[in-house]
Regions:
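Amphipathic terminal alpha-helices
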Residues: 2, 9, 307-321
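N-terminal Rossmann NAD(P)H-binding glycine-rich loop of SDR-like oxidoreductase domains
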Residues: 10-30
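NAD(P)H-binding glycine-rich loop region in Rossmannoid oxidoreductase-like domains
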Residues: 56-106
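NAD(P)-cofactor binding segment of oxidoreductase domains
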Residues: 82, 96-127
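Conserved Rossmann-fold NAD(P)-dependent oxidoreductase catalytic core, especially the SDR/UDP-sugar
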Residues: 112-161
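Glycine/proline-rich active-site loop of Rossmann-fold NAD(P)-dependent oxidoreductases
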Residues: 139, 167, 179-182, 193-203, ...
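NAD(P)-dependent short-chain dehydrogenase/reductase
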Residues: 140, 174-222, 227
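Mid/C-terminal beta-alpha module of Rossmann-like enzyme folds, strongest
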Residues: 233-282, 292
Length: 321
């Protein structure tokens, strides 16, 4: 396991979030000393683990630790590996309910602060959690890491600004790799689900509650990925020279579900009186399936969850609605 080569500490930005907190737990289980750069404690509020250290906790939601150069320098000190999962984002932002200028300032400046600190302090590996949202709307039904990204054309959740933000951060990471020699790995991650959290978008839930006719385009749907599959990829890539300077898709095509199948499944498992109708004359949503052949060849990573696992998680999620 590459993590056995870590001599110092590791830093997880966004370590109190859904994915970050699980990565932190996996790293602690391996006996590593972990720093968390986050504005909140999340599931670690009562945690007293001797190998766990918090930096930047308590900063405001908008101006969290990433944007503060001094806090970032402190966070990166004595660190071998940086896992950059933090992002300041709000689901409503793409409808311009929050100022995009502020969010781009915090996130891009924060990523630059981390990269600069990583370069100056001799970090051995910088891993960035990007998103498959960078692909935007595509004519092809399958995309790989060489596909031209068109995030500005995306019209669905989480909106074009999110993909543009992630793609910009990707380019900055790769710049520091090629110009400064900082080992970088970028993961483009699909929608992540857990055993108890796989809620569809609010739009889908709202449609169900209207108890009307729901029209969906034949064949349209989406793939996702279980959080354990994501954590496995991060651990496999850590300090692995085959991952340096690379972009990898993280998705599980086996979980692909059409919107028709999803709505039928949700109606069967809720009190919704909605009806689903297939249409063939509408334009496809443009959502493609991400190929994971590259990471499977390079690192030996393989997805291991199924569509049944996704459906079980959706049922668990429905209990919280």
């Amino acid at each position: 396991m590459p993590t056995d080569d870590i001599e110092k500490k590791v830093l997880v930005t966004g370590g109190a979030g859904d994915i970050g907190s699980r990565l932190v737990k996996a790293l602690l289980k391996r006996g590593l000393k972990v720093k968390i750069l986050d504005c909140q404690y999340g599931p670690f509020k009562e945690e007293k683990h001797p190998n766990l250290e918090f930096v930047g906790t308590g900063d405001s939601e908008l101006h969290g630790g990433m944007a503060n150069r001094d806090i970032v320098q402190k966070a990166v000190a004595d660190v071998d590996v940086v896992y950059h999962l933090a992002i300041n984002w709000d689901g409503h932002t793409w409808k311009h309910q929050l100022p995009l200028a502020d969010l781009f300032d915090v996130n891009i400046r924060g990523t630059l602060n981390l990269l600069e600190a990583a370069k100056s302090q001799g970090v051995r590996h910088f891993l960035f959690a990007s998103s498959c949202a960078v692909y935007g709307s595509q004519e092809s039904k399958t995309v790989d890491e060489e596909t031209v990204c068109k995030p500005e054309l995306w019209e669905g959740d989480p909106g074009p600004a999110y993909g543009i933000l992630k793609l910009t951060a990707e380019k900055l990471c790769l710049l520091y790799h090629h110009e400064c020699g900082l080992p970088i790995t970028v993961f483009r991650i699909e929608a992540v689900f857990t055993d108890s959290d796989a809620l569809p978008s609010r739009k889908i839930i709202d449609n169900l509650r209207k108890d009307g006719i729901i029209e969906v385009t034949r064949g349209d749907g989406y793939a996702s990925i279980h959080v354990d599959e994501v954590i496995h990829a991060f651990l496999l890539a850590t300090l692995n020279k085959k991952a340096y300077g690379q972009i990898f898709n993280l998705s599980n095509p086996a979980t692909f579900i059409t919107y028709y199948e999803l709505y039928k499944f949700l109606i069967q498992n809720t009190s919704s009186k909605s009806k689903v109708r297939l249409t063939v004359d509408q334009t496809s949503s443009g959502r493609a399936i991400e190929s994971t052949k590259k990471i499977q060849r390079a690192l030996g990573w393989k997805p291991f969850k199924t569509k049944d696992d996704l459906k079980k998680a959706i049922i668990q999620s429905l209990k919280s609605i």
